[in-house]
């Protein structure tokens, strides 16, 4: 990679960091978290050099502010993408079952997921309390849902959370 390419890459993640600080789309708690790392370029780079991507195990990442972190913004983006797909398929009336584990932010992420799907006219079945993956799997089949979402990072360390779609 040339020096010029490195500078361009650096500009991209710094530009995204600045966008999150200045945009009215992000709440004060998020902005304060980002302000606390303003002098740590490596941390800024790690949080913004890429967006979380779906892998074989869904989305997984450290909880925190940034495009490369699990937070209400990345969960919202993933959920809206799934909603768009469900609407394209015309299966919104079948619904989506949603479950979560005991990790930090799991309940909040699952509630947000249900609200976004509902706002798109998609029926949801949100468990009232934490449930294991096999119970979600059973619910998807029993209720004949078009999809199931599990908020969990499985075996990853406690600072992680995840978003799995079935």
Where is each model-derived feature located?
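An N-terminal, well-structured beta->alpha segment
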Residues: 3-113
């Amino acid at each position: 990679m040339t020096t010029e390419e490195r500078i361009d890459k650096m500009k991209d993640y710094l530009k995204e960091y600045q966008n999150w600080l200045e945009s009215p789309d992000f709440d004060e708690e998020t902005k304060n978290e980002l302000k606390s790392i303003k002098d740590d370029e490596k941390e800024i780079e790690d949080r913004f050099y890429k967006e979380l991507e779906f892998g074989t195990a869904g989305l997984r990442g450290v909880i925190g502010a940034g495009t490369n972190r699990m937070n209400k913004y990345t969960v919202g983006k993933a959920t809206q993408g799934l909603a768009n797909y469900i609407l394209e398929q015309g299966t919104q009336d079948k619904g989506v079952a949603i479950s979560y584990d005991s990790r930090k932010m799991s309940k909040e992420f699952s509630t947000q997921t249900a609200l976004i799907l509902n706002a798109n006219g998609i029926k949801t079945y949100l468990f009232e309390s934490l449930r294991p993956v096999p119970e979600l799997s059973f619910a998807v089949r029993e209720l004949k849902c078009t999809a199931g979402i599990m908020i969990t990072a499985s075996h990853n360390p406690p600072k992680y959370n995840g978003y799995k779609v079935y």
